[in-house]
């Protein structure tokens, strides 16, 4: 990637990751299939378990880091994965300058070893619990278990590579409902990923699945 005068790599000019070494901390950045989203890898674990998606400044109040990123302006989404943070910019945002601001926020946060979440929100740090799934037919319990297992082992790692995440929401009459998060939310190619990638995979491993839809 070509660098501008300020040393911040221009997004989208060349494929592959960019490395930013700041005060002895190496942060890797990667583009994603969603042109509005950039993936930041701080070289350490972000979420020990599960993921967390913030779609507004109000939701970000649960996390000092997410709140700081939203406070930069031109940010419409923040997503925490196992070892990465995806940041989605608003329409017309200039990533060439915004990226440097995000890197500074990440450096401040991790250098100070600050908590990822405020204590009052500790119960909500991971993927929504099982009881948040949509109601399903008890007779489908085995099918649902298979869907969740394949989603965790086959689908989640793939979408995480693209800076996104998925959450199982329900299964009804052959249709699986999944919520797309991070870079996958609002991505121009998310529909194709859902239909041609995830749907094909789940139909292969779980014959009872006839369709996959976005929740």
Where do the protein language model's features map onto the residues?
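Residue-identity detector for glycine
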Residues: 2, 6-7, 12, 16
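Domain-level signature for proteins that mediate thiol-based redox and metal-cofactor handling
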Residues: 11, 17-215
